[in-house]
């Protein structure tokens, strides 16, 4: 590892210090990214990376010639893809500038061949992977930015203005005769109006930075502060200066490092990378000068080297923060490199490829093939666990994905002290195969919902639940606990709305129940004749735990996905996962009660009609984050129908046609009397900002199909999680009452309907492309 005064290499142990102490020490940890699937991109240098939500898009650069491929790395799935681009595909280039704004990527400048530079501006629409060459104009008497390489190209997410600073141009504009010229000019272009793009040269005030190339820049915006931070670069010598450009006043300010309060700066460098995480700019790698120079005045390649050192500039405190490596062993950190790419996803920095700087193969530089990530802080607290589907001996749950999490630690407990007193925990330890007797419905359950009609399905169901499509079981169920086995196959579909709203679930439920009372009247009248079920119709309802903090917790597992079908939990024969956590993290390993290596001697099954509590914490290389809020849900009671399956939705002129298969356990639970279909709508509460989604019933009848009119679809809430989708829930009822519901997301990317977007460059609606009206809808199935 390179010596760098800005980085302290120390091996830490999680057990030696608390979370707050680690944060005070600014401990960071490198981890190599392994076990990625998909087509890996070719190693290279001079390429760029931009971030689109959880995707890192890498393109350009080269080694043995320019590379014209584009790859996207999904940080959640750990998967590479190579989208096929269309449109005005640009000529392959290196050392260009690249930014992302909303769902678009922009490329400016770069080198298309040795000595030949460009000033072309391209736009890539990532929803279609379609390139478009843009033709910006200039103000009167103005000029376009000259062709250049090694410049910085950054964008303000607030103003949607992109800034170009510095770079290197060829004065002769002749590829065969290259006369390099370092630049210090500053240009801006407003990308909010793609039909009226204008380049404008800015004349900032104050002494500005000297001309340079191969530097980095980031834009920091918070409240009224908006500034561009320029660091390092090359102008015949490596530079280590740092500058602020106030984007509101266009005034340059140099940050002097002669004040001890600014900390100890890293070594001057060029061809490094910088990313912004929170209020910190992390600087990695690049070419740095050697501490001892050769005696000759002629510069040789031995006078500088590639570094693997890190620097961290705190923008709010205006100081270099000393970082501490969690582990400094040679194989636990990336080797030095330059011309690589870096991207920040959440609180993590990713780096990929770049020039090795130490070895040469024939006339070509050796490029690194590896990807590394840097954990900079413990992961955030996850949102509450949400129920997707309840079975008789299983609970399918999920929670919002935490960016920067390598895995999740899930624990389960009994619902309250009364249920704990009748639980078989102690007996199951000595006789794990012995099934406890089923506890009959208690009077407590009746007291909890005295006004709920008998057998009535709840009119409002939390939309934070898991989303899936459940195909029909090809074989008749032999017991009432059978569930489809192909659920939860894709963690991308588990992302849910903001967990901060989940605290209002109960209040939203009660308020919306009053609004939808008329819609439920038919069900209420029929339900009066039914026997009161033991909360079988309430298995989708999630409740926040306010007490029972002293009840024990049991391990379900350390898993890599934000979803799981819980059927068992570990008994106390197994060592606590908390004690195994360090070793599992160090080896990037997972351990779950569902693993085939564990037998009935190691685990305890869930029982029907039982209320369980859940909590989850996110894990990364630095350890375990805070536990989520506790949530509880209940397994089904025997005798009620299971959830409908094989849901199919097709578009029609009148609206949407839904069909489904009856519950798989009808041979046991008996004849299905009716089905209810619910549509997710926005809850119209007084405080709309904090309101929960509500489910409005749009069908109640005996047939396993229904038509949802366009007038109802017009009131639907379009969920923007991952992909625009409309959410339905379908439940079946027998003589005892309603069983659990199946939730399905009807993807809208084939429909031409208005979809609300969160992209900053589109304040209204975007319209999805219209596909065949009778095509089968694609589902986010788990």
Swiss-Prot record:
Compositionally skewed regions (Basic and acidic residues) per UniProt: 14-25
Subcellular location per the Swiss-Prot or TrEMBL entry: Nucleus
Keyword Nucleus among UniProt keywords: yes
A GO biological process held by the record: determination of adult lifespan
Iron-sulfur in keyword set: no
Transmembrane segments: none
Phenotypic consequence of gene deletion: RNAi-mediated knockdown causes 20-30% increase in lifespan. Causes smaller brood size (50% of wild type) and lower hatching rate (21% vs. 99%) at 12 degrees Celsius. Increases intestinal expression of skn-1 target genes, including gcs-1, gst-4 and gst-7; increase abolished in an skn-1 mutant background. Substantially reduces enrichment of hcf-1 on the efl-1 promoter and enhances enrichment of daf-16 at sod-3 and mtl-1 promoters. Two-fold reduction in the level of embryonic expression of sup-35 in a lin-35 mutant background.
Recorded superkingdom: Eukaryota
Main localisation: nucleus
Region annotation Disordered: where it falls in the sequence: 1-25, 423-553
SMART domains (UniProt xref): FN3
GO cellular component: histone methyltransferase complex; nucleus; transcription regulator complex
GO function term, MF aspect, one: DNA-binding transcription factor binding
Positions annotated as Kelch repeat: 55-103, 105-151, 161-222, 227-271, 280-324
Gene3D superfamilies assigned to the protein according to its UniProt record, in alphabetical order: 6.10.250.2590, Immunoglobulins (2.60.40.10), Kelch-type beta propeller (2.120.10.80)
Sequence positions bearing Phosphoserine: 423, 431, 449, 498
Record text on subunit structure and interactions: Interacts with daf-16/FOXO. Interacts with deacetylase sir-2.1. Interacts with the 14-3-3 family proteins ftt-2 and par-5.
Protein name: Host cell factor homolog hcf-1
Gene: hcf-1
């Amino acid at each position: 590892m390179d010596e760098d005064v800005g980085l302290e290499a120390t091996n830490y142990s999680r057990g030696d210090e608390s979370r707050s102490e680690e944060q005070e020490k600014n401990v960071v940890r490198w981890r190599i990214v392994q076990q990625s699937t998909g087509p890996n991109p070719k190693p290279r240098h001079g390429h760029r990376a931009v971030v689109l939500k959880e995707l890192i898009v890498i393109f350009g650069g080269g080694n043995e010639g320019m590379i014209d491929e584009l790859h996207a790395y999904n940080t959640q799935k750990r998967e590479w893809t190579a989208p096929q681009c269309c449109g005005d595909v640009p000529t392959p280039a290196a050392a260009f500038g690249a930014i992302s704004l909303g769902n678009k990527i922009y490329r400016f400048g770069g080198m298309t061949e040795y000595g030949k530079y460009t000033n072309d501006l391209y736009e890539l629409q990532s929803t279609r992977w379609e390139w478009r060459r843009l033709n910006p104009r200039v103000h009167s008497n103005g000029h376009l930015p000259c062709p250049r390489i090694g410049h910085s190209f950054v964008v303000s997410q607030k103003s949607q203005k992109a800034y170009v600073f510095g770079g290197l141009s060829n004065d002769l504009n002749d590829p065969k005769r290259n006369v390099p010229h370092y630049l210090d000019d500053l240009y801006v272009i407003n990308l909010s109006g793609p039909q009226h793009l204008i380049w404008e040269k800015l004349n900032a005030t104050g002494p500005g930075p000297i001309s340079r190339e191969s530097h980095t820049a980031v834009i920091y915006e918070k409240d009224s502060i908006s500034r561009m931070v320029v660091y390092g670069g090359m102008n015949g010598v490596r530079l280590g200066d740092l500058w602020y450009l106030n984007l509101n006043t266009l005034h340059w300010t140099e940050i002097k490092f002669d004040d001890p309060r600014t900390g100890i700066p890293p070594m001057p460098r060029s061809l490094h990378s910088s990313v912004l995480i929170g209020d910190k700019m992390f600087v990695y790698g690049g070419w740095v000068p050697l501490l001892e120079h050769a005696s000759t005045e002629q510069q040789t390649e031995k006078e500088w080297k590639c570094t693997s050192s890190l620097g961290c500039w705190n923008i709010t405190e205006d100081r270099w923060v000393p970082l501490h490596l969690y582990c400094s062993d040679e194989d636990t950190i990336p080797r030095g490199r330059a011309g690589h790419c870096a991207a920040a996803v959440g609180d993590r920095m990713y780096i990929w490829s770049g020039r090795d700087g130490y070895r040469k193969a024939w006339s070509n530089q050796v490029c690194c093939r590896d990807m590394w990530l840097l954990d900079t802080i413990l992961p955030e607290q996850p949102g509450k666990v949400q129920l997707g589907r309840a079975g008789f001996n299983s609970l399918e749950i999920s929670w919002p994905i935490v960016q920067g999490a390598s895995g999740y630690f899930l624990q389960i407990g009994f619902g309250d002290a009364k249920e704990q007193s009748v639980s078989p925990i102690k007996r199951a330890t000595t006789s794990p195969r012995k099934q406890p007797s089923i506890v009959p419905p208690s009077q407590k359950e009746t007291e909890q919902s005295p006004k709920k009609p008998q057998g009535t399905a709840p009119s409002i169901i939390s939309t934070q639940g898991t989303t899936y499509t459940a195909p029909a079981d090809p074989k008749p169920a032999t017991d009432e606990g059978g569930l489809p086995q192909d659920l939860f196959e894709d963690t991308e579909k588990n992302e849910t709305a903001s967990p901060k709203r989940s605290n209002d679930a109960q209040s939203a439920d009660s308020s919306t129940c009053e609004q939808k009372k008329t819609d439920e009247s038919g069900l209420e009248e029929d339900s009066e004749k039914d026997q009161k079920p033991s909360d079988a119709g309430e298995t989708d309802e999630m409740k926040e735990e306010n007490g029972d903090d002293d009840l024990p917790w049991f391990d379900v597992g350390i898993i890599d996905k934000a979803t799981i079908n819980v059927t068992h939990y570990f008994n106390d024969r197994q060592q606590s996962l908390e004690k195994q956590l360090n070793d599992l993290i160090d080896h990037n390993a997972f351990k779950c009660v569902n693993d085939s290596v564990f037998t009935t001697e190691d685990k305890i099954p869930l029982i029907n009609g039982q209320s369980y509590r859940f909590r989850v914490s996110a894990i990364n290389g630095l350890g375990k984050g805070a536990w989520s809020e506790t949530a509880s849900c209940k397994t089904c009671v025997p005798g009620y129908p299971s959830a409908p399956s094989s849901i199919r939705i097709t578009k029609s002129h009148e609206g949407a046609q839904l069909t489904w298969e009856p519950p798989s356990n009808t041979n046991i639970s008996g004849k299905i009397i009716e089905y209810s279909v619910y549509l997710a709508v926005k809850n119209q509460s007084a405080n709309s900002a904090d309101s929960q989604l509500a489910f409005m019933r749009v069908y109640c009848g005996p047939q396993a199909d229904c038509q949802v009119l366009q007038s109802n679809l017009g009131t639907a809430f379009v969920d923007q999680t991952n992909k625009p989708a409309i959410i339905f829930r379908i439940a079946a009822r027998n003589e005892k009452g309603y069983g659990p519901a199946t939730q399905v997301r009807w993807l809208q990317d084939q429909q031409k309907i208005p979809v609300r977007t969160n992209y900053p460059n589109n304040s209204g609606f975007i319209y999805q492309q219209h596909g065949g009206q009778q095509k089968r809808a694609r589902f986010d199935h788990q």
